[in-house]
Amino acid sequence: MRSSDGQEAGRPAAILIAGPTASGKSALGLRIARAFGGTVINTDSMQVYADLRVLSARPTADEEAEAPHRLYGSVDGAVNFSVGHFQRQAAVILSEMAPDQLPVFVGGTGLYFRSLEDGISDLPEVPEPIRQQIRAEAEGRPTEALHATLTLRDPKTAQRLRPSDRMRVMRALEIFAATGRSIGSFQETRLPGPLAGRPLLKVFLSPEREILRRRIDARFVTMMENGALDEVAALRDRRLDPLLPVMRAHGVPGLIAHLDGALSREEAVQRGQGDTRRYAKRQFTWFRHQMGEAWHWTTPEAAWSLAEALLSAPVGQ
């Protein structure tokens, strides 16, 4: 899709590279950063975690040495890293960059990209003791029962949440316990996005579906060869809350089931591949319906050519 807002007309203030998993985003981001003095900023909710270098397909140490990389492997798995955390850290990174440095945001998490321009709701931080208390009370209870509890405490929020949406129900309960207020009352106020109103080049890498499917399957096998199982074994040994994002990363539940003897290695690999393929499909759907016309749906090579033309043009053209 071509931009209708004239963003091609001048040098972009930042490059945004999105797309499904295994579409070539990281390689393109590094290529642009090397060529134009850029800093690659992670925009993927799993690649932030230190525990998942292999299974999240983070750039290698050698790749990270070729250009500055930020927000990769910088968060401990025990942290429930949110869109709010991402937006605040991205804003700090942008404020620290020199004027001639090019921010290159790379990842597959749509809400992260949206927060850069549209901002996010100004939700309060939940103190860890309260979070742990709510999770302890929820342990062993079905999600529908938690939703019933939310209905008693915050009926308006409960009405708009699916009774089966455990994560959002839990989040609403945590906010209410911490503040005594509905999560909806905080969502009425938004923090501005750090890239709002700035000229951007936004590309979504869109491989053919069958090619992408083969890449996903092959990459999971390669991850297993490169130590993904050992990585997950170390994560399992930490005995973290199973609701934490790091514990629900694609591949983690199946590999833990294999380590526990519930699945064979082959079954765990197939489950990880299938989960990742379904996630890629959801990424296509989400971006198509949520991110508007200002994104170029394209290939890595075409995206490189577009970026090269814009970034090489004399200032003012």
Swiss-Prot record:
Keyword tRNA processing among UniProt keywords: yes
Cofactors, names only: Mg(2+)
Residues holding substrate: T21, A22, S23, G24, K25, S26
GO-annotated molecular function: ATP binding; tRNA dimethylallyltransferase activity
Organism for this UniProt entry: Methylorubrum populi (strain ATCC BAA-705 / NCIMB 13946 / BJ001) (Methylobacterium populi)
InterPro entries for the chain: Dimethylallyltransferase, IPT, P-loop_NTPase
Subunit structure: Monomer.
Reaction it catalyzes: adenosine(37) in tRNA + dimethylallyl diphosphate = N(6)-dimethylallyladenosine(37) in tRNA + diphosphate
Designated name of the protein: tRNA dimethylallyltransferase
A Pfam family the protein falls into: IPPT
